Curated annotation (Swiss-Prot):
It catalyses: [phosphate](n) + ATP = [phosphate](n+1) + ADP. Keywords: ATP-binding, Kinase, Magnesium, Metal-binding, Nucleotide-binding, Phosphoprotein, Transferase. SUPFAM superfamilies: Phospholipase D/nuclease, PHP14-like, PPK N-terminal domain-like. This is Polyphosphate kinase. One of its GO terms (cellular component) is polyphosphate kinase complex. Residues 1-21 have a biased composition (Basic and acidic residues). It comes from Mycobacterium avium (strain 104). ATP binds at N86, Y516, R612, H640. One of its GO terms (molecular function) is polyphosphate kinase activity. The gene is ppk. It is an enzyme of class 2 (transferase). Its EC number is 2.7.4.1.
Length: 730
């Protein structure tokens, strides 16, 4: 049931005036670089897929994992939670940006020709479908399966009297004191409802005159969402071993609403949740102190306008209309689902100590190049012998990249450590190493990107801690986010100076390095060392260098560098055939890069894309993309590496940049060429595994639909499992 469908046409109408992925970060208002008009090319107008709908398709693939009975049960619950968190961020940033464009009258059409209003309408329809499916996967599949394993998520009606008595004591002692029922009447205005909070909308009736009044009760966000009952239900000896029962907190509060409203009759109560605009605008050019400006904007973010209202499907029309009016939410922004709201809380269930219901434990191995070297100089000695390519999480981050930085901090011959920090872990060994380096008298420089979305507050804390320890902290370039993953170590060796470098695709975060798939290059190559020296000078000083020896650096060099190499691959293919371009990345959106791949396809070059998330390229269309093949791999680890290969010109590149406007135009990004044949062979093996016809994946069709592959009845291999087995083998 979608009661708000009656109003969807209001969004779709063109009468009113006319960015993230899960960390997409695109500017919500600024227009992207214009694609080459179709009239100036032999390419059709409809050659792009909509990026917003493509992102929703990505999240639908995450949901498909939750619905996969072959996966361990608690992993399926985790994917339900990831789906919910992903969708929250999408609305807080991407949908919020489209709404702002629409409200400001900026009717800039997307690359596929849609106005902001039309995109909002399509997003609402698509979201309602997948949100309903999300709820049904939980209700009809995951929750019953959990119950079969002794993990029961119950309702108040399922409880016996002993359990209700137990919860009555818990509620009175632990929950009731922190609840604040907020009435709405002439003396009490409608309360502020914070974004992503879970709430109960309550209608009460006065017993004296029968007058009805609305009140809101916020479900506390500093207690567990699921209340665990202290004892299993009575049963035969051994029958309940391992059985746990959980009651959602909102059900507990609802059961005791009479205690919150004594003397009043509870007429009805319903759960609801709103999402607010969390996209920030910091006027960097006008603010001398970026850190203070960002802190002011962070304080404002919690008061952003609502962009989504989630309700349970049993909410009455009258209650819904009241919420729409008081919260100033458009009916088309209502998402109505059966069952529980905010399934991101299922992470609490995932954290149960039930290893049999999770993926088998995986412990990363130390890279062979570092396995037998334990002295403080071992990493440097290894890199003097040759470059090393690490592939996380299969190669341990802590015994490679982290050890590289820690040994640099402890080595008396190291003179300087310069590093970019975009997202780092809560108790970061990388940050501690930089502090130790500064305290030891080394020149320690940290470029902390305090504008990393949803990590701003944490990065501000780290920036201040680093500054207090004597680390030189800079915040990058005005108007640009610094997203590159680079570290430069300067070491005195005899009478000479040698530079050691790390360039990666992932963050310097020891926790996510166990969950994210990334690659990194550790090298003592002089040309890369010189390039990183120039790069850090541009980040910390007034250097405006835009060309490098062995790097492509955005915002000036990556788009042009990639397109130029596509053209060289085309020319080489025309000369001797065998043209092939392979790309692995998180997102492919940039129209100019996409058009260059279309030209390669038209020339007969085979183009293979492995993309985790958004893909605006339309493959498999006769005349311009019949030689392009796109697939998506999702699994236990988040596929995060960015790798590009041009076969005929024999170049492999790795780095931080996806092919998106934000990466190529509004960020400092770095791609590095990997030249060592032993290392390029490793990257080639990675591509061959990902592109193997039997690899479990989704394939993108010319109609924009993603289809599971291989088809039923064919041999199926898991790319990530194969890599784990390969790294475990001697």
């Amino acid at each position: 049931m979608m009661r708000h469908d009656r109003n969807v046409t209001e969004i779709d109408a063109e009468t009113r005036p006319d960015e993230n992925l899960w960390h997409s970060g695109d500017s919500a208002v600024g227009a992207p670089p214009a694609a080459t008009p179709a009239a100036m090319t032999d390419l059709p107008e409809d050659r792009y897929l909509n990026r917003e709908l493509s992102w929703l398709d990505f999240n639908a693939r995450v949901l498909a994992l939750a619905d996969d009975n072959s996966l361990p049960l608690l992993e399926r619950a985790k994917f339900l939670a990831i789906f919910a968190s992903n969708l929250d961020e999408f609305y807080m940033v991407r949908v919020a940006g489209l709404k702002r464009r629409d409200e400001m009258g900026l009717s800039v059409r997307s690359a596929d020709g849609l106005t902001p209003r039309k995109q909002l309408a399509l997003i609402g329809e698509h979201t309602q479908r997948i949100a309903t499916r999300h709820a049904r996967v939980f209700l009809d599949s995951v929750r019953p399966a959990l119950a079969e394993e002794g993990i029961h998520i119950v309702t108040w009606a399922d409880l016996d009297q002993a359990e209700r008595d137990e919860l009555s004591t818990y509620f009175t002692e632990q929950v009731f004191p922190v609840l604040t029922p907020l009435a709405v009447d002439p003396a009490h205005p409608f309360p502020f409802v914070s974004g992503l909070s879970l709430n109960l909308a309550v209608m009460v009736r006065q017993t004296e005159d029968g007058g009805q009044h609305f009140a809101r009760v916020k479900v506390p966000n500093n207690v567990d969402r699921f209340v665990e009952l202290a004892a299993p239900r009575a049963g035969a000896e051994g029958e309940n071993r391992g059985v746990v029962r959980f009651l959602p907190m909102e059900e507990l509060i609802a059961a005791f609403l009479p205690l919150l409203f004594p003397g009043m009759e509870i007429v009805e109560h319903h759960a609801f949740r709103i999402t607010r605009n969390a996209d920030m605008e910091v006027e960097e050019d006008r603010d001398e102190d970026l850190l203070q400006a960002l802190e002011r904007e962070l304080a404002r973010r919690r008061f952003g306008p609502p962009v989504r209202l989630e309700i349970a499907d049993d909410m009455t029309e009258g209650m819904l209309e009241l919420l729409l009016r008081e919260l100033d939410v458009h009916p088309g922004d209502v998402i109505e689902v059966p069952g529980l709201l905010d399934l991101s809380s299922l992470r609490q269930i995932y954290d149960l100590d039930r290893p049999a219901l999770k993926d088998p434990a995986f412990v990363p191995d130390t890279h062979p190049a570092f396995a037998d070297r334990e002295s403080p100089k071992s990493i440097f000695a290894t890199l003097r012998e040759g470059d090393v390519l690490v592939h996380h999480p299969y190669d341990s981050f802590s015994t490679s990249v982290q050890r590289f930085i820690q040994q640099a901090a402890a080595d008396p011959n190291v003179l300087a450590i310069k590093q970019t920090l975009y997202r780092t872990s809560g108790d970061s060994p990388i940050v501690r190493a930089l502090i130790e380096a500064a305290e030891a008298g080394k020149q320690a420089v940290a470029l902390v990107e305090i504008k990393a979305r949803f990590d701003e507050q944490a990065n501000i804390r780290w920036a201040r801690a680093l500054e207090q320890a004597g680390v030189h902290v800079v915040y990058g370039l005005v108007g640009l986010k610094t997203h590159c993953k680079t570290c430069l170590v300067v070491r005195r060796e005899g009478s000479a100076i040698r530079r050691y470098c790390h360039i990666g695709t992932g963050n310097y975060n020891s926790k996510t390095a166990r969950l994210y798939e990334d690659v990194g290059l550790l090298t003592a190559a002089p040309d890369i060392g010189a390039d990183l020296t120039d790069l850090f000078n541009s980040l910390t000083g007034y250097s405006r260098k835009v060309s490098y020896r062995n790097l492509l650096v955005a915002p000036h060099g990556i788009r042009t560098g990639i397109i130029e190499r596509v053209e060289r691959e085309i020319a080489a293919h025309r000369e001797r055939g065998q043209g092939r371009i392979r790309l692995k990345m998180n997102a492919l959106v940039d129209e100019q890069v996409i058009d260059s791949l279309y030209r390669a396809s038209q020339a007969g070059v085979r183009v293979e894309v492995v993309v985790r998330g958004i893909c605006a390229l339309r493959p498999g269309v006769q005349g311009y993309s019949e030689n392009i093949f796109v697939r998506s791999i999702l699994g236990r680890f988040l596929e995060h590496s960015r790798i590009i290969h041009f076969r005929n010109i024999n170049e492999f590149w790795i780095g931080s940049a996806d092919m998106m406007h934000r990466n190529l135009d509004r960020r400092v990004e770095v791609l590095a060429q990997v030249k060592d044949p032993k290392l390029t062979a490793q990257l080639d093996e990675l591509f061959e595994s990902a592109l193997d016809p039997s690899t479990r994946c989704w394939e993108l069709g010319p109609d924009g639909q993603w289809t599971p592959s291989p088809q039923e009845g064919h041999t199926v291999r898991d790319h990530q499992v194969s890599l784990m087995e390969r790294h475990r083998s001697p």
